[in-house]
Swiss-Prot record:
Function: May be involved in the mitochondrial lipid metabolism.
Protein name: Genetic interactor of prohibitins 3, mitochondrial
Source organism phylogeny: Eukaryota, Fungi, Dikarya, Ascomycota, Saccharomycotina
Residue ranges of domain CP-type G in the record: 171-378
Organism in which the protein naturally occurs: Candida dubliniensis (strain CD36 / ATCC MYA-646 / CBS 7987 / NCPF 3949 / NRRL Y-17841)
Cellular component aspect of the GO annotation: mitochondrion
Annotated transit peptide: 1-40
Principal location listed in the UniProt entry: mitochondrion
Chain's gene name: GEP3
Superkingdom in the source lineage: Eukaryota
Amino acid sequence: MFSRLVLLRKVSISLGRYYSSQAHPQTYIYNLLSKSKCRSCGIQLQDKYPDKPGFYRLPGQNDNNTDNKSKTSELNKKYEKILQNLDVSDRNLLINNFSAPKQEHEKITSVPSLQQVTPVEEDACDTLEVQKTQQGQSLSCKRCNDVIYNSKNKSVYDPKRDNLNKSEFPIPKLQQVLSTIPIDAPLVYVFSANDFPMGINQEIFQYRPPQQIFFVMTKSDILIPKTNVAFYNNFKKFLQNYMFKRFNVPRENVFIASGKDRWKMNDLYHFIPNYAYIIGDTNCGKSTLVKSLLINHHVKHWKYEARQQRQNERPNGKQSSSASLKNKDFKQLDRLIDSFSSKNGPGTSHIPGFTRDVVPVDIDGIKQLFDVPGFTTNENMQDIFDKLNHKQIARITKGTSTFKYGSLKSKFDTIKNGQVLSLNGVGYLQFPGQDSMYQIRNVTRFALHKFKNLEKVDSILQRNEIPTSMSSHFIVNRQQQQQQRNEIRGYYKRYIVPPFYGTIDLVIKDIGYINIKPTGKKLTNELMVLYLHPSLEAIIRQPILNYIDPPSPKKLIDGTKMKSFITSDIGKTPFYSRLIPSKIPSDPSSFLASSPSSDYNQLNQYLQIDESSESAYNDILELDETNKYDYWIE
């Protein structure tokens, strides 16, 4: 029976590759080259030029490192010294010398070296590893190994500046990525729940009609509790409506999953077409999603075999259709997943640009997918590595739970009277003055800190070194702290936050969002201003929680109920708005004392509103439910 299954699997693989070669010759080429590619990033492997991309080293191959040799030699010396001081019987036991002379007076004339004392099983493991290497399996380039095991290596970080070596982590544009994909191949566009809808690049519809693209929201564990089916259905219904009314994407082409928690993997397996290319923004979770599909399929086979084994262990040969797994089975499963994940691609990392070429992924010979490098529209995206160390990047891009930190029951902080909110030093949000008050809920990994005003922030950044007591609020590298001086005036970008009425989310790409709720009576039309590092992008949107756990519909004056957030016509009102780019005064003396009227003028000019018209934004305009979206632009 087992040989028959193996034969059927081989036949299905051969037929699949044959048909793919007929329909998509480019896909067939990727399959042929997959054995000589890095399993993690997809780059073509080479072993001749260590300083060029794709260099790899075979397992067991020496580094010719003199430091390692000296360390090994010193270890041998200590080992031999200890061995000489042992009794003969203990010495024979230590070195497994069972053929040693039995007489105590006989002495050992030579001491075996440390390399000779190796377990017998290691030879078999080495042989198996060599066989895997000869078959071209589980090979990774040096850069990928350094990211996983040695992140301080020069192939990852520039040793002179402790920042990202950008030549090893290229990030292409959308057009470059699509040029590597067959024009009629299925496309699966992955975007993150962490910064929705910023992960959807609308340029994709210039190359493919919306009816031919499948959309998958991943990292949904950040938004939706895994056990709450009602919340999942609510948000899925909203997302399908949004994608249909905003981009004309068929509702059945939209799916929600979580690669990290391997949530909805069985349904996702059937949702994604065979030979599909997985595309999306860099760091959106594409590789994690593909890897989770691969692991999920592997786990299903293992559970089936484990249950079969449990049935065979039952007394008196009793058979059962559902043999339960034991605790030791699940412990073994965790080890199996870790081992399988470390040996099978694609690789995953928090560093943008980790995937460098198309990575073919064969799921048990039944379905084949292609993990594609992520793209970006922000040319300054990698500049954040000039400011932060890699540990901080890994921390702030993980995201955090909406229901734990963003719900009405979550802890909030209060901002008032023109205070400035620091986003760990990579951004500063200036709030209006004149007795204004806001509730802030932090749904990011940023450590937020309140300053009295912008002058206080500026005075700290003007110092030669940030005080130790404040260092946790500025997560820049020590080497870069000196360079941060004057950057609010020059390097950081200034944005005007469009006017809003009610609660909003300030969304920061790849990071998360900050929920902002005005409290008390509105006394000023003064606008919020955001100073942001150029590598980051931000928008405002309607509160995402309203579409997961919507409030009960309110009754109108005539007694009818308002439509809920989920069933409302999302096409008639903007769901989000871009921020308004603003000029930073070149004169330092006028920088901290810019008037609100200057921001009003820039807002009206950007939206092409005549300042003499009634709709022009100014101090006398009344903002309410009827016009609260008039100054939003998608």
